[in-house]
Amino acid sequence: MQKWKKLSFCAVLLTSLAFAGCGTPQASTTGETTGAKQEQSSAPQTMQVNLNSGEPSTIDPGLAEDIPSMSVARAAFDGLLRLNEKGELKEAVAEKYEVSADGLTYTFHLRESKWTNGDPVTAHDFEYAWKRVLDPKTASGYAYQMYYLKNGQAFNANKAKAEDVGVKATDDKTLVVTLENPAPFFPELVASVTYFPVNKKAVEGNKEWASKPETYMTNGPFTLKNWEHKSKIEFEKSDSYWDKDAVKLSTLTLNMIEDANTELSMFEKGDLDWAGSPLGDLPLDALDALKESGKMQAQATAGTYWYIFNTTQKPFDNKKIRQAFATAVNRQEISDNVVPYKSTPATGILPPTMALTPEGYIKDGNVETAKKLLAEGMQEAGIKELPPITIAYNTSEVNSRIATVIQDQWRKAFGIEVKLVNKENKVHREDMKQGNFTIGRGSWIGDFNDPINFLEVFKGGLNTSKWENKEFIDLLAQSAKEGDVAKRKEILKKAEQIVMDEMPALPIYYFTYAWVKQDSVKDVVVDALGFIDFKYASNQK
């Protein structure tokens, strides 16, 4: 998942809370669960949160690529499966499902549920939505998440027809899915935003269907009530939702306040019920006091903050020059001085929850080696001086501080001046996609707990570095067909080694989220992959 992770926002870092081992990360649920423990108040419950990235890039689930966009879609839509209030994967629109003995066929049986216009949600809606994501005309950056479907990649590459794709509604209530290869994590994928249904009538009736309340047809806990662009997005509880009794909030408002100090000030005044990650930000200078007050909560997240090199532009079309700039970065200095409480320096692409090489790949802040690599790279490139270099990042306090420190580290290591450019999030993302950058701030937080999800970022539509390596691509394809867990791990380890040797991205740190909430807020689910879900949230003031 892009978390501009990965990408549109910055997770605040606290004491390193790396997950133990490589098991499935657990979600966090705020406060005690309500349910039978509390009598439901008759007064309407509302919640005010902040979306500090500003305007979501889209609220179309088939096009969503970042946490803000996906969080909005998660409030408005429901998939076949969903995390419950305890963070457990449970049936949602699917009442039940079966998996064949060979792990290749999933059969989902749908319950009675409705769209906001009253039409029934059918298996045909899911078939249409999934094939729409894969359709090359849609140009979905997340189409690769559907490559696990039989002929999914072939259809996306115009080498197969839509009817060849392994998803078929055999009737209104039955969806049969056939995979290319067994994928034990497929149920996790099915719960992700990309796999949400969309209503064909709404999508094809208006190209701008996902921009106005009157055309935004949804099937989830909330329905879009109002969208004041660059100000706020307002949701109200959906009366047509199949599980509406579990939804306690009457309204949910996502404000768009980009300044972290303003966000915290509004929280302290009671104008916000939640401040900080995953959707907002907390001012770094306030973290000590918030921690000491006991109000702040923290949760490790399966994500990596990195810089992307544009490998089509000089000088970063040269591998050794990329290695030089990566090696010169002192990540420990950033952890100790830029972001408090010793965040974990990232010496590899994969976060600790998925690490294949726990010791990492990069010797942190090795200036002498960096100088040697730079000299060798410049000689190979036939240049005597470096062209102008710019670090581009989306606006946030943390992003700015990190860029300033790395700018200084490269100045001291190489005697060069690096320009810093901050941009509104949507502009930054589009410039990255179009290749209008030299070095760009980015990140990734897993969509599911498997190394392949991180490694696949460096191929296909999300690969903003434009780096290509045939051996790497072949290894990823080989891993998809390998049924032996140990052998598959070794294949992915080789693939990661290639990425770290070629260095299309410069890893900087591993994410930890931090937030504060009003005492009345309960049952907000923050999963270990960086998503927030308000379906079960309550706010009895």
Name what the model sees in each region.
Residues 50-101, 217:
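N-terminal lobe/hinge region of extracytoplasmic solute-binding protein
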Residues 95-142, 176, 315:
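Aromatic- and charge-enriched surface segment that lines or borders ligand/interaction sites
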Residues 123-129, 172-178, 182, 220-221, ...:
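Alpha-helical secondary-structure segments
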Residues 127, 143-200:
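Surface-exposed binding/hinge segments that line
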Residues 179-247, 251:
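Gly/Pro-rich hinge or "lid" segments in bacterial periplasmic/extracellular proteins
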Residues 207-210, 240-285:
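Ligand-site clamp/hinge motif
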Residues 344-377, 396-401:
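Structural transition elements
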Residues 417-428, 456-520, 540-541:
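Extracytoplasmic/peripheral linker and loop segments enriched in polar/acidic and small residues
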